[in-house]
């Protein structure tokens, strides 16, 4: 029996080997206890404020919307210590690990941002850290690999399968199956077996809470829409959670359209996948005709994931949130627009959300609308990828 509901509608659950059930139960009990413990909450809040740098700014983009009637704000998770929203929930889970008496942390990472956040939290709190990362991602995210190693983490390249995030997830789970007595698996997104989707949402929900307070202070009303990119879905659910009951606020999640949905080279399981069991949960995923997990693709390593968190699947199924896709080229155009228009270098992941916001503005320039994009991370890690693409195009 679980203490919290393991499902969001029909999605979610706890589909793991029996050997891991006690570890998941211990984690759930520790989380429920910690949520009621003023000392834990005070320590978490202190770390978020004085170590990570919360609250993050809400920045008005004046140049990108020039000549239109839209007001576009960015929630600046890129300004957080570590460079992305990942730091929020990593600090929470690392504190939970200490609470459970664990001495080691296992993590998976795609773009490397979760790995960096995990490495910094482990260095801060005195925990051993090993991070599984697809061999392809190790190559395309070398700055983050070095950052992790600088902070004492062991980075383990995964060469199996497609050598990307899904394979890193599999290896991390395999490791945890043999080490759960001393190690905590610090999952990096709002997916996986219960209670992870709930824990990650709660440790990210300050994104939406701060956004709501800030936009009310600046504009005196709630936004017409909040937008966030969706891979596994943690930055998006962190933004959406506090707005779910505000039914007049549109929640828009942006999946990676890759080379175009029709090409098959994408990472958009919510709109173009089928429900199945993967990574310990029931959720939409990219599958072949015979039910095997299909390779996902995105220019952004952090969105290159063949499934999606179960709460997003539920919000999609009941029509509370809308999910769309943005191609690599559209994301790259938005990346360049923000660099040149506002002097902000965004992560390629976040650029997907920005691209859809810019589409909305272009489609109705005379419409008075108030939009907030969760700028989930900064683009330092992506500059070499973007450089190579722009060089091939002759743009630099």
Curated annotation (Swiss-Prot):
Record EC number: 4.2.1.20
Swiss-Prot/TrEMBL keywords: Amino-acid biosynthesis, Aromatic amino acid biosynthesis, Lyase, Pyridoxal phosphate, Tryptophan biosynthesis
Catalysis performed (reactions): (1S,2R)-1-C-(indol-3-yl)glycerol 3-phosphate + L-serine = D-glyceraldehyde 3-phosphate + L-tryptophan + H2O
Family assignment from sequence similarity: Belongs to the TrpB family.
Family annotation (HAMAP family): Trp_synth_beta (MF_00133)
Pfam families: PALP
Quaternary structure and partners: Tetramer of two alpha and two beta chains.
Cofactor: pyridoxal 5'-phosphate
Listed CDD domains: Trp-synth_B
Positions carrying N6-(pyridoxal phosphate)lysine: 86
Protein name, UniProt field: Tryptophan synthase beta chain
Stored InterPro entries: Trp_synth_b_CS, Trp_synth_beta, Trp_synth_beta/beta-like, TrpB-like_PALP, TrpB-like_PALP_sf
Source species of the chain: Pectobacterium atrosepticum (strain SCRI 1043 / ATCC BAA-672)
Record's keyword annotation contains Lyase: yes
Recorded name of the encoding gene: trpB
Single GO molecular function: tryptophan synthase activity
Pathway field: Amino-acid biosynthesis; L-tryptophan biosynthesis; L-tryptophan from chorismate: step 5/5
Function: The beta subunit is responsible for the synthesis of L-tryptophan from indole and L-serine.
Superkingdom of the source species: Bacteria
């Amino acid at each position: 029996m679980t203490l919290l509901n393991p499902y969001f509608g029909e999605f979610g659950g706890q589909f793991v080997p029996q050997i891991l059930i006690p570890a998941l139960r211990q984690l759930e009990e520790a989380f429920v206890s910690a949520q009621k413990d003023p000392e834990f909450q005070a320590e978490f809040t202190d770390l978020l404020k004085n170590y990570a740098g919360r609250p993050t700014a809400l920045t008005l983009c004046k140049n990108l919307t020039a000549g239109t009637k839209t007001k576009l704000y960015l929630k600046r998770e890129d300004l957080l210590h570590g460079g992305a929203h990942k730091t929020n929930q990593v600090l929470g889970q690392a504190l939970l690990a200490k609470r459970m008496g664990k001495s080691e942390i296992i993590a998976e990472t795609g773009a490397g941002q979760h790995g960096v956040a995990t490495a910094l939290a482990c260095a801060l709190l005195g925990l051993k850290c090993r991070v599984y990362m697809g061999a392809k991602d190790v190559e395309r995210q070398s700055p983050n690999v070095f950052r992790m190693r600088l902070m004492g983490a062991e980075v383990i390249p995964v060469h199996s399968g497609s050598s990307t995030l899904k394979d890193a997830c599999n290896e991390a789970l395999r490791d945890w199956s043999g080490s759960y007595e001393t190690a905590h698996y610090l999952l990096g997104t709002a997916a996986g077996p219960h209670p992870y989707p709930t824990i990650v949402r709660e440790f990210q929900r300050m994104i939406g809470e701060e956004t709501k307070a800030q936009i009310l202070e600046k504009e005196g009303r709630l936004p017409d829409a909040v937008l966030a990119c969706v891979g596994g879905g943690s930055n998006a659910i962190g933004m959406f959670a506090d707005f779910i009951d505000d039914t007049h606020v549109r929640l828009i999640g942006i999946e990676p359209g890759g080379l175009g949905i029709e090409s098959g080279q994408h990472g958009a399981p919510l709109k173009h996948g089928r429900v199945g069991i993967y990574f310990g949960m029931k959720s939409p995923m990219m599958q072949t005709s015979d039910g095997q997990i299909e390779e996902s693709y995105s220019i952004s390593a952090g969105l290159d994931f063949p499934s999606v968190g179960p709460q997003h699947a539920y919000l999609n199924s009941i029509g509370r949130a809308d999910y769309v896709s943005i191609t690599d080229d559209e994301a790259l155009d938005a990346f360049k627009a923000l660099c040149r228009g506002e002097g902000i270098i965004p992560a390629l992941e976040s650029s997907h959300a920005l691209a859809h916001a810019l589409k909305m503005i272009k489609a109705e320039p005379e419409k008075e609308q108030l939009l907030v994009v969760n700028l989930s991370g900064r683009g330092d890690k992506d500059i070499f990828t973007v450089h190579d693409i722009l060089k091939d195009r002759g743009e630099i």
